[in-house]
Every structure is written in structure tokens, then in C-alpha cells.
Amino acid sequence: MKLLGKAVLVTGASRGLGQALMATLARRGARVVGVARHAGEMEAAAAALRAEGLDAHALTYDVGDKEAIYPLVGAATALVGPIDVLVNNASTLGPTPLPLLLDTACEDLQRVLEVNVVGAFRLTKAVAGSMVVRGQGLVLNISSDAAVSAYPRWGAYSVSKVALEHLSRIWAAELEGTGVSFLNVDPGEMDTRMYRDAVPDADYSKLNRPEVVAARLVALLEGRAESLPSGTRLEASKLEAA
């Protein structure tokens, strides 16, 4: 896929992997809209890229709020045109320190699912119709190794990523032949604020930098993404950077 001129929507783009993806995509010529709940951080990230002469925009919405989805997509489309690539990156862990399932409040589980699964589902629904009509589009869902491993205390987050991945596979089956494809990517353990909140005693020097992972994901998009079967699951650690 040639990213030059492509309209890309990245959620959770005010920090961490989302911010790194937004920057890397913009520097490859994409027209990027970043979305996050934190207005100041989101606008600062976009403004820094615009200062480089890049096509980057900031929107402030909560993807876990169903009333925000269509205004979000409408605003993004007004800025860069119909979305070619959607990156569902926004995630929440729920309360930290991470609790055991026995101690997890139902309301906290519900919030994690609203953001990580239902929000991504709503956004995908909101952009997929246009993609089908145009005969092209890619949805990149940022998953986790927690989707395949049962880590104590990561229950709510793990369940959300399992659901997100399987939704991708069902989307892939239902939209086969339309030109719209779906990929799940496990970025691996990264030195992000979210990971530090979850694992405060980790050796952060051994974790991946978001910028490194972003470079690998963008290389995937520019390389073999379109040739992979829709619904494929990938690990960023096994990808090559551009």
C-alpha cells in the first residue's frame, strides 16, 4: 500500500503507540487524524507534526461513548476525506493496580469492553460502508499477547482483546471479496504510560519503544499487508522495520 495521500484515522493517538503511529504515518505522506480523550496532549502531538509541514489533525472524542462515533467519523472525513485506513489502537486497562477477577467490578469490566471492543466495533461499522463502496480499505486492530495467554490480573483487558481479534476474523469472513481487509497485530510489551501503570516494577529498559513498533507496523502497511489473508494475526516482534 502506498501511504502517500491516504486518509488514516488513529485512535488513542495522544501518547504511546498511537502517537508514534500518527507521526510515522504522517512522515510517510499519509493524511492522518489522531483521536484521543485528552485534548491538550492530542493537539500538541498534531501541532508538532504540522510544524514539520505534515498533514496531521487532532480530534477529541471518547471512543467508548456511542454518541461520539458518528460525529468523530464525520469530523475526520471533513479533514482528510473518506477513511482508507482505520487503526483501532485506543485501549483502557481499567483500574490499576490490576485486580483479580474476583475483585473486578462489573462496571469496570463494562468500561474496558466499551472502549476496547464496542468502541472499535462502532468505529469499524462507521467507516466500513464507505470502504466497501470504494472497494478498498484496511482496518488494523492493535491487540496484545494477553489475547492468547491467561495472565492473572489482566482479565478484563485480556477478554477485550480476544473479542477484538475474533471480531476482526468475522469481519474478514463477512467482507471477503469487497477489497476491505482486517489485520490483528500484537505490538508486544512497550514502554508506555499504560504499561507502567499496569506493571510499575518492570525493567523498562527491556521493553520496546513505541517508535520502533510503529516503524514495523508502517513497514507492514507499505509492504505485504495487502497480500496477507484478511483476519491474519501478526506479532510486531517478527516484523521488519522499513
List each model region and its residues.
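Substrate-binding pocket helix/loop in short-chain dehydrogenase/reductase
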Residues: 97-101, 105-110
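Residue(s) in the substrate-gating loop at a strand-loop-helix junction
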Residues: 144
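The beta1-alpha1 cofactor-binding region of Rossmann-like NAD(H)/NADP(H)-dependent oxidoreductases
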Residues: 40, 60-71, 106
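C-terminal helical subdomain
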Residues: 177-180, 184-185, 192, 201-242
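Conserved glycine-rich Rossmann-like NAD(P)H-binding loop of the short-chain dehydrogenase/reductase
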Residues: 28-44
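Conserved glycine-rich cofactor-binding loop
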Residues: 7, 12-15
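Active-site helix of classical SDR
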Residues: 124, 160
